[in-house]
Amino acid sequence: RDRSPSRGLGDVYKRQHQLYEPHKFEGKNITRGFERILWGFFKKMILADWAAVFVDAIFDNPDQYSGLAIFGVLFYTVQLYADFSGGMDVVIGIASMFGIELDENFKRPFFSISITDFWHRWHITLGTWMKDYVFYPVTLSKWMGKFGKWGKKVFGKKTGRTLPICLANLIVFFVVGVWHGAAWKYIVYGMYNGIIIAFSGLMAEHYRNWKKKFNITGKENWYHVFMIIRTFILVNISWFFDRADTVGQAFHMMKLSVTKFAPSQLLLIPAGKEGTA
């Protein structure tokens, strides 16, 4: 059997055996699948399209709507999630009607407590593909083994064991950036995520020591909420690079988010896409 990677197949490859198994139409599958399809279309055609009106207006005219930069990226979060997860809802719903079960591709990503956790919940099939065909091959390669040995000699055993994983994550998210598109903004988007994950890995022991010092177990409700909000902010910063036309525009809009804030400008955005530039 050919096990070469395919960017386009994703979860379908692992589930293709279901295509050759006998299935029969069942009322509960039809009902469940139809409900999932309707929910998907609602997210794509209502929520995503509604959010896109504000996203396009703000990102296409950042100086005209300078006080709305932060709203632009928040609406983009709604647009992305509703569009991507809505599409998967339709696919999963159709498959369900035929008795084929597909894995969920989004699992409450905005309740993540870290960037690593976010990527375990967001676009899961992409993350699985990257893990199987990029992360593991890189981590288990001979040159990475040599790099790990060098790291242990220079930085000690603990850091030396972590360095190969950090480097592998950087490579993975470089590929994630290129996967999104052949432009610098996508590479910066990918590396932004990779650097945060790599840095978190290097700092993991320090984080544990700090939590112990301040008597934080990690189970406190306030701490959990703090981690969710922190991660949500970090994720939204990355969206600036994903949606802006250039890296420069992304940084410009980040600056506007801090220096200017005028929610009243939302009233100036035309109600339809035809009114946006």
Residue locations for each model-derived region?
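Membrane-embedded transmembrane alpha-helical bundles that form the catalytic cores
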Residues: R1, S6-T276
